Design a protein with these regions (language model features):
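Cross-family detector of peptidyl-prolyl cis-trans isomerase
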Residues: 1-186
Length: 186
């Protein structure tokens, strides 16, 4: 048997035959099931990761933290202020959406039980869950389900609706004290 014009006569399907498929829908998810390979542009400042090992399956239930390099400084708590460098990658697209390395400046964050200030920013829940207990000097990868990221709304245009996120975070400083406010000069 052979093919003629794309028809497969040996299977009994002619070139002008209608086909009907029966499909069992097993599950529906607003969030992607798999992560795309990461594309990280090279940074201009030392230390920026050029590769991020994306999880094969998108994070669904829990925040997962992988220690890439363990520091030996104080441990972060939910009451801590952390100074960090980071790169964030969309699980759905594999594209970098943010990087403090690219802005040429680390940021200071207030963990969930610390009070945000004009110099220490609040963060998504996945950051607090992923950084709690990590040591100053560590580099960690945090895989975050969409519920602990930007939720069903996302953060357009870079973070889609229900998009799981992957961050690589370098913890430069852990402190129990809020950073000082910038001084103004007149």
């Amino acid at each position: 048997a052979g093919t003629l014009g794309g028809a497969r006569y040996e299977k009994g399907i002619g070139p002008d035959e209608d086909l009907v498929f029966v499909v069992d829908l097993v599950a529906v998810s607003a969030s992607p099931m798999y992560c795309n390979e990461a594309t990280i542009p090279k940074g201009t400042r030392d230390g920026k990761p050029t590769e991020v090992k994306m999880p094969v399956e998108a994070p669904v239930d829990d925040v997962t933290t992988t220690v890439l390099l363990e520091g030996d400084g104080p441990k972060a708590t939910k009451k801590s202020y952390l100074t960090v460098d980071y790169v964030g990658v969309s699980c759905a697209s594999g594209q970098q959406f943010d990087s403090s390395w690219d802005r040429e400046e680390p940021i200071t964050i207030a963990m969930s039980d610390a009070t945000p200030t004009d110099t220490a920013f609040s963060v998504i829940p996945g950051w607090t869950k992923g950084l709690d207990g990590q040591k100053q000097g560590s580099v960690v990868q945090i895989d975050i389900p969409f519920e602990d990221g930007y939720g069903t709304a996302g953060s357009p245009p870079s973070i889609g609706t229900s998009d799981p996120l992957v961050f690589v975070v370098q913890i430069l400083k852990v402190s129990d004290e809020a950073p000082p406010s910038p001084t103004t000069t007149t």
